[in-house]
Design a protein with these regions (language model features):
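Glycine-rich phosphate-binding loops that contact phosphosugars or nucleotide phosphates
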Residues: 73-210, 218-222
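Aromatic/hydrophobic pocket-lining residues that form π-stacking "cages" and hydrophobic walls in ligand
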Residues: 62, 156, 214
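Cofactor-/ligand-binding subdomain signature composed of acidic, glycine-rich
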Residues: 2-48, 52
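Short, positively charged patches
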Residues: 17-20, 57-61, 72
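Short, amphipathic alpha-helical interaction segments embedded in low-complexity terminal/linker regions
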Residues: 213, 218-314
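Gly-rich Lys/Arg/Thr-decorated short loops/hinges at beta-loop-alpha junctions or inter-strand turns
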Residues: 37-45, 103-114, 226, 253, ...
Length: 314
């Protein structure tokens, strides 16, 4: 009983659990007034996230180094935090053609679409789920919890830290247990939600903004983009094929037919096609350049250009 009392007291002190003064009469407002209020609250998030940019940049560098060394980025969270983790991780394979960005959600995959909040309190499950991933010194683990005290996530981060992985806490409340358990923290103090305690709102939005920066920033540092183009896009359907062709046209200056031919000759590998077009080299040489540059597209183009035959024959 004492434990429950302490938990309740600690929870009520969190800023994300407190009542938002501007929303006291939420149920009496018109639809437009509700929309304006939520929009106004959301408008504060960019500035809140901006104050954490140095820590976000540190996370980008850590993740890029981990992925460059063959390690993984693993997100872990419960409830809404786990779902936004899954969303960012799921977008990395089609966008960057990498499968080493993964997620763990309390309650397992079924929790993505159903209520499994009871799993949030299961520390043992958090440790076990993390242990199954066998985290180590080459990995970066990001624990996401707006409160900074979710038992599942806290236990997972503690286990990962013990195993030698680099750990990062992403939370909305400073000085939390999760922050203390990790190597460092990214804190976005969004304040009280429009709907008191509903961290699926500002807290989740701010955290998705942070995850966008970390994953996109790390992939950019690794050279998995070219300029601001998704050159690692996987053309698995017609829409993505057209996108890949458009990217090749823009990046290389080639016409549509030449871009399509290069994409076909590359076996559907957009970066290979770009190196072929930009450096005017055959497929094998483009593949070799990308391998030598560890997938860094701009460096691969430079390498292939230096070694291209004078005739430029393909």
């Amino acid at each position: 009983m004492r434990s429950n009392s302490n938990l309740s007291s600690n929870l009520r002190r969190l800023r994300t659990e407190q009542s938002n003064d501007a929303a006291q009469d939420l149920d009496c407002k018109s639809s437009l007034e509700i929309a304006r209020l939520i929009n106004a609250e959301d408008a504060t998030l960019a500035a809140t996230v901006a104050r954490a940019l140095p820590q976000i940049a540190r996370a980008i560098d850590l993740v890029a180094a981990a992925l460059r060394g063959g390690g993984r980025l693993i997100y872990v969270g419960a409830g809404t935090s786990g779902r936004i983790a899954a969303l960012d991780a799921a977008e990395c394979p089609p966008t960057f053609n990498i499968d080493r960005v993964q997620f763990i959600i309390a309650g397992g995959p079924k929790a993505l679409a159903s209520d499994s909040e009871i799993s949030e309190d299961d520390s043992r499950q958090g440790r076990e789920e993390m242990a199954r991933r066998n985290p180590g010194k080459h990995d970066v683990i990001i624990g996401i919890a707006s409160s900074g005290r979710t038992p599942f996530t806290l236990a997972a981060i503690e286990l990962a830290h013990h195993c030698g992985a680099r750990t990062i806490a992403l939370t909305c409340n400073p000085g939390s247990p999760l922050e203390r358990a990790a190597h460092f923290a990214i804190v976005t103090p969004v304040g009280p939600e429009v709907l008191a305690g509903s961290s699926r709102m500002k807290a989740a939005t701010a955290h998705k903004m942070v995850l966008n920066m970390i994953s996109t920033g790390a992939m950019s540092r690794l050279g998995y983009v070219y300029g601001n183009l998704m050159v690692n896009v996987v053309p698995k359907n017609e829409k993505l094929t057209q996108r890949a062709i458009a990217i090749l046209e823009r990046a290389s200056g080639a016409g549509g037919p030449a871009a399509r031919l290069a994409l076909e000759a590359s076996g559907g590998r957009t970066p290979v096609a770009l190196v072929m077009l930009a450096a005017k080299v055959p497929r094998a040489q483009a593949v070799a350049a990308l391998k030598k540059s560890s997938g860094h597209v701009r460096r691969a183009i430079a390498l292939a250009t230096k070694s291209a035959p004078v005739t430029g024959e393909q």
